[in-house]
Structures are given as structure tokens and as C-alpha cells.
């Protein structure tokens, strides 16, 4: 189960506008960006959360519709706010690992040991 699909399913199922309002597109994996956009547009237009049935009628793009059907099939028992926290943690960890990877790729080969340690301390702080 993907955390993003579980979050979207729960937010739509329980109509949790509060959790959705603090969910950012960049927290989601790229394959969910189009579905996020459709939900966000519906919220801005109608000032309420769409149902899954509403989205089935609104979505014209077949890839986005397929993603919605996949989300609908997910079995979820967790609360939306908890799923959002998990998604934020996953996003943050990925950003940290990407930063460390960039640091290693760009600097380790060109620095001595002390400079590398100093740069790692700067990243941590």
C-alpha cells in the first residue's frame, strides 16, 4: 500500500477538508500530482471535498482516472491526519537522503577528511 493513495482515499471517504488543506502537492509522489490537481481544483471551485464518485465524473484523463480507481481499491484503517504525518516523514527523509547524496557526489572526491567532516556538521546543524 502506498501512503499517498491511502491518504487520498481516506480524505475523500471521510471528507476531511482540514487534513486536505494542509496536504501539499510536493509531499506526493509525482504519479499522484495530476489527481492532486483535480481534487484541489474541485475544492477551490465548490469549497468542499469531492467524493470519489464526483471525481469519476470530472476526470477525463485516462491515466488520472486509472489512478483514482487504484486509490478507490485501497483498504485503509488509519486516520487521514496520521497518514499525512507518515507522508510528510517519508518526504522529509527522501529530501535529506537526496541532499546527502548530492553532498557526497559533489564534494567528497574534492575534499580532505576534515573538510568533509566540517561540511557534514553544517548539514546536520
Where are these regions (language model features)?
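Noncatalytic partner-interaction/assembly domains of nucleic-acid and motor enzyme complexes
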Residues: 1-90
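Interdomain "pre-motor" coupling segment immediately N-terminal to P-loop NTPase/helicase cores
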Residues: 73-125
Amino acid at each position: 500500500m502506498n501512503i499517498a493513495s491511502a491518504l487520498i482515499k481516506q480524505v475523500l471517504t471521510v471528507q476531511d477538508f482540514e487534513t486536505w488543506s494542509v496536504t501539499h502537492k510536493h509531499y506526493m509522489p509525482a504519479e499522484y500530482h495530476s489527481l492532486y490537481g483535480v481534487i484541489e481544483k474541485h475544492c477551490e471551485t465548490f469549497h468542499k471535498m469531492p467524493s470519489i464518485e464526483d471525481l469519476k465524473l470530472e476526470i477525463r484523463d485516462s491515466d488520472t482516472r486509472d489512478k483514482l480507481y487504484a486509490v478507490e481499491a485501497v483498504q485503509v484503517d488509519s486516520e487521514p491526519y496520521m497518514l499525512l504525518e507518515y507522508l510528510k516523514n517519508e518526504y522529509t527523509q527522501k529530501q535529506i537522503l537526496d541532499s546527502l547524496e548530492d553532498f557526497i557526489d559533489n564534494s567528497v572526491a574534492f575534499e580532505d577528511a576534515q573538510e568533509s567532516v566540517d561540511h557534514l556538521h553544517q548539514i546536520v546543524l
